[in-house]
Swiss-Prot record:
Belongs to the class-V pyridoxal-phosphate-dependent aminotransferase family. NifS/IscS subfamily. Keywords: Iron, Iron-sulfur, Metal-binding, Mitochondrion, Pyridoxal phosphate, Transferase, Transit peptide. It comes from the Eukaryota. Its EC number is 2.8.1.7. It holds the Pfam family Aminotran_5. Catalyzes the removal of elemental sulfur from cysteine to produce alanine. It supplies the inorganic sulfur for iron-sulfur (Fe-S) clusters. Plays a role in both tRNA-processing and mitochondrial metabolism. Involved in the 2-thio-modification of both 5-carboxymethylaminomethyl-2-thiouridine in mitochondrial tRNAs and 5-methoxycarbonylmethyl-2-thiouridine (mcm5s2U) in cytoplasmic tRNAs. [2Fe-2S] cluster binds at residue 425. The modification N6-(pyridoxal phosphate)lysine is found at residue 303. It catalyses: (sulfur carrier)-H + L-cysteine = (sulfur carrier)-SH + L-alanine. SUPFAM superfamilies: PLP-dependent transferases. This is Probable cysteine desulfurase, mitochondrial.
Length: 501
């Protein structure tokens, strides 16, 4: 069979499979428009490739694709030439969203879906290019090493770093452990004090507590009610024996962005190292390690639509920062992290980083627009409030308190929306969020808070669906609550002394 005949047969088969999937959804939901809207999600992210990758796939500018022009993304019709790339699995996945079998995803702080462009870049390294990147005696190793170094360059360019300053790890948790423990142990003969913040990620807090058990002193700075630190308190906390200050870029629960540039200036003046956990900020907001005087940084791939299981530590070379390695072995990654790299993961990370850099302004504008729509809709519900600073924040993380409602009950009632009441790393605990407690929220308000994540593939239809369903569920739960009856009668609950919770 000729190449053209084979292509036509393949396209016909895909169209037949898509038609079957759409028939299944029509029978279940009787609403083809919803299916087209749901498929629009895949149309933007998967069926239509980036102009930089495959110009022939789409001639529409990203502004229109993300709803930044006259047409919103959910209203965009499916291009005819895109149907040939839709598989049955993709169609059924999209279809299952509108039939209630697969919830809408709004937990982007926990993880993000793998961008299909990232997957495409990874596939050759599972079977075809399978060499060990550390094998330097044959072509298989050279080819894998070249791919790894290209990815290292792409990852470094996002934060204006030297590629030699990027050390690959298994993720941000390992990077935080390696950096904090490594820098403290290397300089312990001269400096035994570190400074951090009460609202840091749990892996940072636990790493610092482990160092306390080794004899180090740690100062945990409080935050203001908006979630930001007081720079004067930071300046006063730094001592002559302080080795490192660790402040996260974007908080994973309330989305506040700390003033990295101002913190970096203080640390440089005081001659202490500045570390930032940027897992939630890398590739999403502008971060320049040189302009901000950042010496150490932790980043992760799966927060930026890359694969899970791969991350990196940025370690400045000039002025040089020394670390005592956590993992010993073959001396890979300049002796700081031994172990064979997985080229497929590294390449996926590099592709995700490149896409984030190229499309950051489009993603940020798209997410900001949807974030404001979500906030306006949810704050229209009585007795609700936004947690964290309303201006200095990443718009993709929206944390709302719904007074007189238990957050766990609200989550259980929203089965068609994938949400979280806080960090995925502590979601198994029923204790109130330590981040919300740190900004002054009561136990009751902390328990009533929900975190909404907005990402690259979120649509206006999903935002409106979330607003409608959250409003309905909050009203339902409040009508069941005796506390709500007291509030409706004008009783100030803060004046009541409860014998038990």
């Amino acid at each position: 069979m000729s190449k053209m005949g084979s292509l036509m047969l393949s396209r016909a088969r895909c169209l037949l499979e898509l038609r079957s999937a759409l028939f299944f959804v029509k029978r279940e939901s009787q609403d083809i428009n919803n299916v087209r809207q749901s498929l629009g999600v895949y149309g933007r992210s998967f069926m239509t490739s980036s102009r930089m990758d495959k110009p022939s796939m789409s001639n529409k500018p990203r502004e229109q694709m993300y709803g930044l022009g006259n047409m919103t993304a959910v209203q965009e019709p499916i291009p005819e030439n895109s149907l040939k790339t839709v598989t049955l699995d993709q169609a059924q996945t999209a279809a299952s969203t509108v039939t209630g079998l697969h919830p809408i995803y709004m937990d982007f702080q926990a993880t993000s879906p793998l961008d299909y462009r990232v997957l495409d870049s990874m596939l050759p390294f599972f079977t075809g290019i399978y060499g060990n990147p550390h094998s330097r005696t044959h072509a298989y190793g050279w080819e894998a090493e070249k791919a790894v170094e290209n990815a290292r360059q792409e990852i470094a360019s996002v934060i204006n770093a030297d590629p030699r300053e990027i050390i690959f790890t298994s993720g941000a948790t390992e990077s935080n452990n390696a950096i904090l423990k490594g820098v403290a142990r290397f300089y312990k003969s001269r400096k035994k004090h570190l400074v951090s913040v009460q609202t840091e990620h749990k892996c940072v807090l636990d790493s610092l507590r482990a160092l306390q058990e080794e004899g180090f002193e740690v100062t945990f700075l409080p935050v203001q009610t908006n979630g930001l630190i007081n720079l004067d308190e930071l300046r006063d906390a730094i001592r002559p024996d302080t080795v490192c200050v660790s402040v996260m870029a974007v908080n994973n629960e309330i989305g506040v962005c700390q003033p990295l540039e101002e913190i970096g200036k203080i640390c440089r003046q005081k001659k202490v190292f500045f570390h930032s956990d940027a897992a939630q900020g890398y590739g999403k907001i502008d971060i320049d390690v040189n302009r901000m005087n950042i010496d150490l940084m932790s980043i992760s791939a799966h927060k930026i639509y890359g694969p899970k299981g791969i991350g990196a530590a940025y370690v400045r070379r000039r002025p040089r920062v020394r670390l005592e390695p956590l993992i010993s072995g073959g001396g890979q990654e300049r002796g700081l992290r031994s172990g064979t790299l997985a080229p497929s993961q590294v390449v996926g990370f590099g592709t995700a980083a490149r896409i984030c850099k190229e499309e950051m302004k489009y993603d940020y504008a798209h997410i900001s627009k949807l974030s404001q729509r979500l906030i306006d809709g949810l704050l229209a519900i009585p007795y609700t409030s936004l947690n964290g600073d309303p201006k200095s924040r990443y718009p993709g993380c929206v944390n709302i308190s719904f007074n007189y409602v238990e957050g766990e009950s609200l989550l259980m009632g929203l089965k068609n929306i994938a949400l979280s009441s806080g960090s995925a790393c502590t979601s198994a605990s029923l204790e109130p969020s330590y981040v919300l407690r740190a900004i002054g929220q009561s136990d009751e308000n902390a328990h009533s808070s929900i975190r909404f994540g907005i990402g690259r593939f979120t649509t206006e239809a999903e935002i409106d669906y979330a607003i409608e369903n959250v409003s309905r569920q909050v009203s339902f739960l409040r009508n069941m609550s005796p506390l709500w009856d007291l509030v409706q009668e004008g009783v100030d609950l803060s004046t009541i002394e409860w014998s038990q919770h």
